[in-house]
Amino acid sequence: MYKKILVPLDGSELAECTLNHVKKLFQDGPVGEVVLLNAVVIEIPWRELNAGDEGHAIRFDYNAFKKTFMDKSRKYLARVKSRFSSEGIKVKTETIESNGPSQTITDYAQKNGVDLIVIATHGYTGMKKMMLGSIALKVLHESNVPVLLVRPEACRV
């Protein structure tokens, strides 16, 4: 029995496809809790900030900017969580500001007693994999918790 399953989500359809696999785990036996995690990387729009006239500073309220991203993440996770309501599955949501999603995911898993991480992978190979990197692959290599990778092919059912 898994006591706590961590499901990192990035807002993509592929990431949400993992939810079907999590629900299947419940069919095979009881699971204590599912944690839906969104690691929010807040990128400051430097290009837009530098678009002002020469010599004029553009005011930027980082806290308001961050709050917008974090609120958007919380609303997104609440919508995803609602899909589990009829299943009788205990679900918790976490929105965490992140400099690197893979590290945030592995740190959260280690600090919070996670038994399994279920994460989607884009399935890139070759040059595309080298250029784009893979959060899922980094999680797989950095985590001391078992990781279930869900490839795109597993979503086309």
What are these regions (language model features)?
Residues E33, K90-K92, P146:
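Conserved beta-strand segments of alpha/beta enzyme cores
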Residues A57-K75:
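A short acidic, glycine-rich active-site loop
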Residues M1-F60, S85-E87:
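Small/aliphatic-rich secondary-structure junction motif
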Residues K4, E13, D107-V157:
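Gly/Ser-rich helix-loop-strand patches that form or flank binding pockets
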Residues A39-V41, S98, P152:
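Active-site loop/turn elements of alpha/beta-hydrolase fold enzymes
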Residues V7, V34-L36, Y76, F84, ...:
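Short, structured motif recognition centered on aromatic/hydrophobic residues
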Residues K24, R79-I117, A154-V157:
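Structural beta-alpha unit
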Residues A39-I42, F69-A78, S82:
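Redox- and metal-dependent alpha/beta enzyme cores, enriched for Fe-S-associated oxidoreductases
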